[in-house]
Structure formats: structure tokens, C-alpha cells
Amino acid sequence: MLRTHSLGELNASLIGQTVTVTGWVARRRDHGGVAFVDLRDASGFAQVVVRDEADFDPLRNEWVLQVTGTVERRPEGNENPNLPSGEIELIAETVTVLNTAAALPFQVDEHVEVGEEARLRHRYLDLRRPQPSRIMRLRSEVNRTARELLHGEGFVEVETPTLTRSTPEGARDFLVPARLAPGSWYALPQSPQLFKQLLQVGGIEKYYQIARCYRDEDFRADRQPEFTQLDIEASFVEQDDVIALGEKIVKALWALVGVDVPTPIRRMTYAEAMEKYGSDKPDLRFGLELTDLTEYFKDTPFRVFQNEYVGAVVMPGGASQARRTLDAWQEWAKQRGAKGLAYVLIQEDGELTGPVSKNISEEEKAGLAAAVGANPGDCVFFAAGKPKESRALLGAARVEIGRRCGLFTDAGDGVAAKDADWAFVWVVDAPMFEPAADAVASGDVAVGAGAWTAVHHAFTSPKPEFADTFDADPGSALAYAYDIVCNGNEIGGGSIRIHRRDVQERVFEVMGLSPEEANEKFGFLLEGFKYGAPPHGGIAFGWDRVVALLAGTDSIREVIAFPKTGGGFDPLTGAPAPITAQQRKEAGVDAQPEPKQAEAEPEA
């Protein structure tokens, strides 16, 4: 071994002992013939005293050293209570340089602000900094905790293929050419969905996996083309069983950061979430529910409010906002595809001012504050139009109001997780289908060519009361699905699955997949359902998002060892990169698949 102790192990119990340690030079300070070196390794820091000028003179930051010396107590008054090794120092007897370091592109110091591009380009240096290092270790603990819990529940960890066939699942596939089958392609899995269902057909009964998933999506903020999920599936379960297991996992994970999550966690229907919060992932750390004013303004003279839906959200104290701030709200709304954000200001004397107040009737003005629950000094924002789009705008405004008014406290930026606000909710009874045009408009890929596509995925079972009617009335059918939301972030989603071939074929038909197309894409699943598939269901947690919340960081890039940028580019390796003409030829990128040979007739 190159060392006898890690730096984090050095403490007063070792005073008088000779030890050998290794690490990087974090900082050096010269004091007239003696140098103090702050040495860093993965476990922490320790102060090394080097008295030989020949040893300390050449040392520079991030050089890699091996130091042998004696542990001594620091002189009185020089202790550092912020370090586990703060009572002692290591008096160096020998200093060996294991490697030198070139001039650094940025300082390996958590107190120095560094641009994300530089940090990702030199991620190996960034990971030496305390916070990224802590996050990697937290992620390891999260993995270990989940594995131990699921093992205790009788689950089996099974690895599913990462080279499979392309199956439409709601996003675009990453495709891999098959060199030995020119013109044919593998796809990287968007999720282990089909394989974990087939494991239930295979009698595994309780499966889990910390799975890598791949989706070739359009550039979106804080999305990664490859991501991780904790994937779980079990046979002979109902919704309550999966939810109970999910709550055990959440409780165990948040306990790692000192947060006790009360269970059972509240449940809310999708319809209630959209009506009250304008989102299927509501942030319940604060109130400010939306108010439906459609009936209130049914006879309004204001043409803008003569619409299918009119709603409002209150900003406490918002009447004191400057005009430029109110104008900025309009730009904020336009960035979200709206024409603007109508408002009224309720003055301290109760008078209504602002653009909307000039266009509504005196009777409407008189009762408005009471209708929306506003007080003098508040601002009321409105949206009118299609219910889905209008509620979404108000829901986003609600969260922005909560942030600007300080109605909740996030972890991070000096706030420990145990001191932050946390609110969890299960959102249940979501629609089974949505118009395919809506899915495409939001950046997803419709699975079939029909007018409808699945909200969750094509393998989600309808709720029992819709089992016989979902194909006749797709817009009314509810899914046997459940999503868990934390502080406005969806951290997991699951459903009871379809386990009967006839039901699965009916779902494919609603989505516009012909029997031939369904058999071509999903024939292996439909075939499996012929042989006694058990009732089953599961859940998948977005592992990167879970770790980001626990770590108190806004970006999932911070919790991935080597992340891509928002555009899918890797500054470290330069991926994606062109391939050579030879590679292109060998991979068969431009090859056409050979026609399938007709199967030979069986002999009589």
C-alpha cells in the first residue's frame, strides 16, 4: 500500500505515531523556512508541516504527494474545528512527488465560481472539489439504500438488454447499426418496460434494476439523452401495493439527508391537480390554488374573458409591484407561448386598478376579491382560453409567485435538506389517452397513426370501470396509473399493466396501430401474453432527479459523473463525433436490409 491511513482518519488518537498518507496539494503557505501544505484526498484534508526547503520549494497546487511523518498536536490556538483532523498536524519526514500537475484551467476550490462549460470539459478536476465529490458519494448511498430495501422485500435484481429492437414508446430511439446484419439496426432502450413485463410472464414476480435509459429527444433544459431510473415490477399486485412500496423507498432515501417523510403520502386525482394547481405535478409546499372564474364571468362585457375557461391566481402583496415588473410578467408569459398575463391590482382601499379593471363591469369588480380570496394589496393574475393551456399558464405563474414571495424554502445554497420544505403527493387517475396532436406539440412522439396516443405508455391498464369502454370513448377513459411528485417534480411514475393480449391489442388499435404493425413492433410481447401472463404492475423512479433533490441542486447534470450539456454534447470527449468512411462502410450505415426469405413449408 502507498499509504497507511487516509487523511480523514487522522485525529488526536494517532498523536505520536508515524503514518504515511497520500493526496493532492490543495494549498501551500510558506512561513520563513517552513511550509504548511493542506493535503487533500477523497476522505478529507490534513495539514502537513514541511521543514525541508528542498522538499517544499517546488511544490505546486494539485501535485500528487506521498508523505511519511509523525502526527503531532497543533500548537494551542492553531486548531481548526471545521476539520476532523483540525486538532493535529503531520510533521513531514519524507515527501515523495508521485506526479506533478500542469497549470490548472480553474482552481480546485469550492469557493471559486467556475463556468459550467469549463467544469464539464475538465470534469475530472471538478470532481476533486468537495461538493461534486459529496454528491457522487450521496448517489452511491442512494443506490445502496434502494438495493438493500428491495432485497429485504424479496426483489431480484435483473439486468435487461441495452441492445434491443426499435419499439415506439413515446420518444425517438438511439439507433445502433448491426455490422453483421447490414441494413438492420439495434435500438438503445428508452426504458426496460417490455423486458420487465416479460420477466413477470417468466415468473420472476419481483424484479428491480438501476437501469440506464436512452431517449433521443429535442433539446430541452435539464434533460439528458442517457439517464438512470430505479425500475421496479411485481406480479399479483394492485395499485395500493406498489404505492406502499414506493413510499418505503422515498422514506428511506430522504432519511439519508435527515428528512422524515410522513406516510401514507397524500393522494390527489389528476383532475383535481389540474383544476387547483394547473399542473399534473403540483408543488404543495404552499397554497395559492387557482380559482375557476368561468361561471363568474359568463355574462362579462370583456371580450377576452368571453372564453371557454377563465381562471385566476392571487399574488399576495403583488399590488406594490412596479410597472416595469408587471411588464416583465407579460414577457414571462409570452416566453411560455401565451399572449400575456392579464391582471388587476387591489389597492389598500379596495379599489381595483390595472388593465382588466377598465374592461369588466362594476358588479364584477365588486365581487372579484371575494371570488378569488384576495386581500387589499394583492395582485390577481388571469388567463383565458382553452382550459389546458390556460391552467398550465396559471400553474406556472403560481410557482413563480411562490418563489418570488418566498413561500417555500429549497434545499441547497446553504440550506440543509432537513431545514428545507418538502411536500409529496401521489397523482392518480390520469387520462389513459390524449390527442396525438397534443403529444407531438409537447415534443413527444405519437406511437401510432391514430388520433389518440397514450398519456403514460401503451402498456398501462385502464381502470377496471373503463376496461370495456376505453376503445369506444378514449377521451373519457382513466388509466390505472400513479405518479409521485416531490416539490413540483415528478420523481416516479408507474401503473398496473395490461396482462391480457386482447386488451393490449385493443389499446394498439385505439392508437392507430394495425394488427400487422402491432405484431411487427410488439409481437414478442403479445406472444408472451398468450402463455399465462400474471396481473402485474410497477413503478420507475427518475434516479437523477431524486439524487438532485436530495443533494439540493437544481440541475441533474450535477449528480451525473460525466453529463452531457442541454444540447446532448459532451465537452469532455467531444461526443457526438463524426465517424470515418471505413467505419461507416463496416457498420453498414448505408446498407439496405436483404428481403426476408419466405419460411419453408413444414413437411407433412
Curated annotation (Swiss-Prot):
A Pfam family hit: GAD
Binding, ATP: R215, D216, E217, Q224, E490, G542, W543, D544, R545
Annotated spans, Aspartate: 193-196
Enzyme class (EC, first level): ligase
Annotated segments matching region Disordered: 571-604
Major location (coarse): cytoplasm
Catalytic activity: tRNA(Asx) + L-aspartate + ATP = L-aspartyl-tRNA(Asx) + AMP + diphosphate
Membership in a protein family: Belongs to the class-II aminoacyl-tRNA synthetase family. Type 1 subfamily.
Function: Aspartyl-tRNA synthetase with relaxed tRNA specificity since it is able to aspartylate not only its cognate tRNA(Asp) but also tRNA(Asn). Reaction proceeds in two steps: L-aspartate is first activated by ATP to form Asp-AMP and then transferred to the acceptor end of tRNA(Asp/Asn).
NCBIfam families the UniProt entry points to: aspS_bact (TIGR00459), PRK00476.1 (NF001750)
Protein name: Aspartate--tRNA(Asp/Asn) ligase
Taxonomic lineage from the root: Bacteria, Bacillati, Actinomycetota, Actinomycetes, Micrococcales
Gene designation per UniProt: aspS
